[in-house]
């Protein structure tokens, strides 16, 4: 039996006892019992009501938390879907740009009437890296007998820069890409890289990356696909060693 029912039972018995009491002292004693039982019952009832209120409050808090969490989960799912769509759109745009670049290079190459020279290597680089590395690499490759498209050797006064570079890209067996901090920040080398990527997709050339004072993480941030390619590193090999390794491919 619960305490509340026990208190009610005591109060009921006391009430009956008062009705049947024959002496005043017995009535007073039973009245005291009735008051105690009534107080105990009221206290127990209040405690039960307090507990019920606390349970209701906790249930309300839980419901509010679940509603907030559901909303947060919905927003997270929405953000993931938006990010996936953004990445998909970027990939689609980039693929379209590469296809357009490839088409442009083919059109330019077929439209020109002059005899086009073929090259073993096209060197894509930032101008800031010429003095420190690129010009020495170009000289070493040429000394080994390689035919290279290198702006300092190939471009002449009055040449169309875009047309000549498109011709060089289209007529080179390999595309050497000198990846550096300067390369990552320049638009023109990035356009050359897009052209080489288009050629590689079409099976017309191969990209040969050279890391020049950059880390794997820096390359991966710029281009995850380039970071996965086996690369030569100017921090590990000399210019002559790099040139010989490249020349062995032709």
From Swiss-Prot:
Record field: catalytic activity: NAD(+) + H2O = ADP-D-ribose + nicotinamide + H(+); NAD(+) = 2'cADPR + nicotinamide + H(+)
Record's GO cellular component terms: extracellular region; host cell plasma membrane; membrane
Keyword Membrane recorded: yes
Cross-referenced PROSITE patterns: TIR
Main location: secreted
Repeat found in the keyword field: no
GO molecular function: hydrolase activity; lipid binding
Domain of life of the source: Bacteria
SMART domains reported for this sequence: TIR (SM00255)
GO terms of biological process kind: signal transduction; symbiont-mediated perturbation of host cell endomembrane system; symbiont-mediated suppression of host toll-like receptor signaling pathway
Subcellular location: Secreted; Host cell membrane
UniProt keyword annotations, A-Z: Host cell membrane, Host membrane, Hydrolase, Lipid-binding, Membrane, NAD, Secreted, Virulence
Documented EC number(s): 3.2.2.-, 3.2.2.6
Residue positions of the active site: 192
Basic and acidic residues bias spans: 30-39
Recorded domain comment: The TIR domain mediates NAD(+) hydrolase (NADase) activity. The N-terminal region is required for localization to the host cell membrane.
Quaternary structure and interacting proteins, as annotated: Homodimer. Interacts with host TIRAP. Interacts with host TLR4, abolishes the interaction of host TIRAP with TLR4.
Protein name from the UniProt record: Probable 2' cyclic ADP-D-ribose synthase TcpB
Source organism: Brucella abortus (strain 2308)
